[in-house]
Structure formats: structure tokens, C-alpha cells
Amino acid sequence: MLRGLIDRFVGRGDWAITVPPMDGALRPNQMLEEAHVAAEARAPDNLILHHGEVVFSSGRELRKLETGAVVRSFDRPIACVAAADGRLAVGLTGAEVTVFEPDGAVTPLPVAQSSCPTALAFLDDSLIVCRGSTQYAADQWKHDLMESGIARQGSGSVVLFPRDGAPRLIADQLRWPFGVLPVGDRIVVSESWAHRLISLDPRGAVRPKPVLSDLPGYPARLAPASDGAAWLSVFAPRSQLIEFVLREDGYRRRMVSEIDADYWIAPALANGRSFLEPIQGGALKQMGVLKPWAPSRSYGLVIKLNGGFEPTLSLHSRADGSRHGTTSVVENSGTVFVASKGGDVILAMPVEELVEQ
């Protein structure tokens, strides 16, 4: 307790507002901003492979990337999707997860263990469900962050649903798990508000183990790469201003109660759409130009990870770009596809043209 008080007074440890720099493999570039647009859609979110085709969620619809044809539509916005061996799992905002079988059978999962779904993945015959929070819906991620501040524990969890059998809790007290990827005998999960990736035991017998910590942004969904590595999307950047606000409980509570969420000093999927948005002095346009290194609440970032989950390559859309809010990535037939939810586009880049740093 005494150490915590001292850390708070001198601004160190959990109370430090420093943000790790983007250098080395995370050195900024314009690769997302210069990438080919594979499709334009309203707030494209979760990219997956289904029956060998790339499909994506957009609002209440699940669409094919190549043709734009609607695969399925729902009465609520889609929060997350996953597919394997003809099976399709869909999590809806403010509702539960439903599994659609190849034979036409439809299986809704228990609401108590599948509410607020943020990411899904199949593991053999089982389905892994990431629950972002017990208090908020999937589209209220900003509320969850502002409510928790820098708390060490959250209300998120990861639950395993066997095809036949009772659901099993793998991990709880997580800070907004937003991505999941089975890797061998473990499950790797992105924990957004903790800025890290953690490794979980599918049996829940071992405590979560960090595999990549102190990321410069808020990690989102994971996807396998063709070379056995992985892709990680980062949907928003960290900043010293936001880190400061997260530590000022009184200010943050008043901001949340009095100001619309779009105008909070908080991470965002897009920026510069309204004059009411908060802005730092370094983000003011000079001679009509916004510098790419200006402080921004939104950003576009995709990271390539090696087998040890170390960054080897990164793709960026910087402060002066528009392809921000990168919530999902998938690789198919030598091309990597990126969903820019804030930029309303899906981008495509040949893998062979991406040079690791």
C-alpha cells in the first residue's frame, strides 16, 4: 500500500503516463495508407475465412468480400464471428452467441456465459468465446475503459464451449479480451486495456502468462499467418494524455457523466470528424497540413508476429491518414486483408511485398 502511494506521488510504476515508442519492427510507415482498397463498406469489423472465402461483418450483415453478397443478416449489429469446417459462430451486440451447423442446425449458447462477445475461435469441436465485460455491451468498449481506469483487474473472461458438455471458464478478471488464437496446446488472447497478449491453458489449470507486453496501442483480433506466425490488429493508439486521464478518477467520472462518448478524451476508431472532438496542440493543422507524427486518438496498425510472438513487421496509417480503427486482419491465398473500421474500407496487400524489419 505504501509503495502504491509513493508511486502515485512520484508518477512511476502503474502511475507512470509514459507510452512505449514505436521503433524497430514497429517503426511508422504508410503501408496501410498506400494499400489497395479491396472493398468499401460501412464500419467493416471482423474478417474471417468461411468456405475458403473471405467474409466480413458490417453492421447487422455478414458479407462476402469478393462479391459483396450477404451471407447472413441479423436483427442486431454483429460483434464478432468465427468459422471452421463449415461451422459458423456469430456473436451479436447486446445478445448471445449462436452457432450455425453445416446441416442447418442452429445452437444458441447460454446468455449467462456468452454475453458481450468480443472475439470467437474454434478449437477442434469446441468454441472459444471472449467476453469483454459483464457490465457493458461489445459496442460500449469505451465506457468499460473509462470505468476501469488503470485497475489491475477487469470483468472480462474467456469461456470454452464444448460441442457436447458444459461450458468451462478458462480465465476471468481480464481487461477487455478482444482477440483469440489457438496455438498448439495453448490459447493466445489479446487483453486490450492491459496492452498485452497472454497465453492461456485450455483446461484453465494454469494462470495466464504474458507473451507480449507493453504494446503502444490497444490490441484487437489475432489471425494465423501462412508461415506459422500470427497477425495482430491494433485498433487505437495509447497516448500520454489518455494515460493521464485514466489516472484522474474525478475528472474522468465527470467527463463520462457530462459529455457525449464521441467527444471523450479516450481512444477512438476515427478522428477529425467533428470540431467538438478533443484536440492537443500538436494536432493543430499548420498551413492546412496535419503532421503524420501529431498526437491522435485514432490510428491504424497491424503487427506481424513470429513464432515467439515477437513483432517482426508492422503496417501503419498515421495521424494524417484515414485508415484507422484496424480491428481485424486475415491472410488468404498470399494476400493479407485488413479491416479499417474507422476508415470504412477493407485493404489488401500481397504478403510477398511485405518486408520484415
Q: Language-model segments: what does each one mean?
A:
Residues 130-152, 235-297:
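Short, conserved, GDST-rich strand-edge loop motifs in beta-rich repeat architectures
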Residues 50-60, 89-95, 129-142, 188-194, ...:
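Conserved beta-strand positions in repeat-built beta-propeller and related beta-rich domains
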